[in-house]
Amino acid sequence: MSRRNAAVKRPVLPDPQFNSRLASMMISRLMKHGKKSTAQRILSDAFSLISERTGGNAVELFETAVKNATPLVEVRARRVGGATYQVPMEVRQERGTAMALRWLVTFSRARNGKSMSQKLAGELMDAANETGSAVKKREDTHKMAEANKAFAHYRY
């Protein structure tokens, strides 16, 4: 274990185009091989597609989608006396948001569709309507935590 001080968390600056911290975080998650401008274009294209289809504010819909995909509890493996238990634990706000963004990107990539921006727009609209794979993943995570509630006293 490192004896040095813990690294200082840098604040996430809001994206200049959408003036949103979440959008900035999403761009970082979308980015592959350091191509940030490509990731920004994908997100802005997805937002314009969302605006066309819904006629509403795409950034607000995006924030709703992230909120709907954010888990409140998760299970973590804990070894006790030779047995490994799945212990349910609360998720901190930051980690929950990060997980939601990661799931949205992962399931967008897995979708069938033409371009990444279309797939991302579809996944975001589904998540905002409380359907879609990212929301299902959150529900599955909550079910796992509920099923393993008996091991909650092993929390650390």
UniProtKB/Swiss-Prot annotation:
GO biological process: translation
Keyword RNA-binding listed: yes
A GO term for molecular function: structural constituent of ribosome
Keyword RNA-binding: yes
Top-level taxon: Bacteria
A Pfam family the protein falls into: Ribosomal_S7
PANTHER family, A to Z: RIBOSOMAL PROTEIN S7
Family: Belongs to the universal ribosomal protein uS7 family.
Protein name: Small ribosomal subunit protein uS7
Organism field: Prochlorococcus marinus (strain MIT 9301)
The organism's taxonomic lineage, starting at the top: Bacteria, Bacillati, Cyanobacteriota, Cyanophyceae, Synechococcales
